């Protein structure tokens, strides 16, 4: 359960930061 959330968060967080800061 937790490993799945961690892996999803690891993919989502960088993309969110990428969109907000526009640094990819």
UniProtKB/Swiss-Prot annotation:
Ranges in a coiled coil: none
**InterPro entries per UniProt:** Antimicrobial_frog_1
Please classify the protein's predominant subcellular localization into one broad category: secreted
Q: Where in the cell is it found?
A: Secreted
The yes or no answer to whether the keyword Secreted is present is yes
Give the highest taxon in the source lineage: Eukaryota
One GO cellular component term of this record is:
extracellular region
Cystine links in this protein are: 18-24
Indicate yes or no for the key word NADP.
no
The record's tissue-specificity note reads: Expressed by the skin glands.
Any one Gene Ontology BP term: killing of cells of another organism
Task: Kindly state which keywords UniProt assigns to this record, in alphabetical order.
Answer: Amphibian defense peptide, Antibiotic, Antimicrobial, Cytolysis, Disulfide bond, Fungicide, Hemolysis, Secreted
Q: Name one Pfam family in it.
A: Antimicrobial_1
Q: What does this protein do?
A: Antimicrobial peptide with activity against Gram-negative and Gram-positive bacteria and fungi. Also shows hemolytic activity.
Its family remark reads: Belongs to the frog skin active peptide (FSAP) family. Brevinin subfamily.
- The name on file for this protein is Brevinin-1SPc
Q: Which organism is it from?
A: Lithobates septentrionalis (Mink frog)
């Amino acid at each position: 359960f937790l490993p799945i959330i961690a892996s999803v968060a690891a993919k989502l967080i960088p993309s969110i930061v990428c969109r907000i800061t526009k640094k990819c």
